[in-house]
Amino acid sequence: MDRDEKKVTTVDLIRHGEPVGGRKYRGQIDDPLSEKGWAQMRDAVGDFRPWEAVVSSTLLRCAAFAQELAQRHAVPLTLDQRLKEIGFGAWEGRTAEELELEHPGILAHFFDDPIAYCPAGAEALAEF
């Protein structure tokens, strides 16, 4: 490689589509993609083909589409536990509405300072 040449690595981050069960704090609950979620993922990538590899969380809502994408483009797939969603502890499986009814203002506190207002039993944001 010439001194003036620089090798560039581009990383595309794609968030999963809608999981089965609607909007809720899912964290590490392993819900698969809904039909709408599959359509969202396919629409997001279209016929884009520059990837040399696909790396994904092990959670179904990510891994199933990653497997499809890697097979479609004949590139290697790596599933990596470290890419799993942050654990939301006591909030897992709950909707924002449920949390606000039980603890008014709790989400505003969390969004203002997620380190100080971490859900009970949740993975600390600083460790995530």
Protein language model features and the residues they cover:
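Short, mixed-charge, low-aromatic patches
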Residues: 1-2, 20-25, 56-58, 83-94
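Acidic, low-complexity terminal tails and accessory targeting/binding regions
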Residues: 1-10, 44-47, 86-98
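Low-complexity, compositionally biased segments
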Residues: 5-7, 33-34, 106, 116
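Active-site-proximal alpha-helix that buttresses catalytic centers in soluble enzyme cores
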Residues: 9-75, 79, 102, 126
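Phosphate-handling substructures
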Residues: 73-127
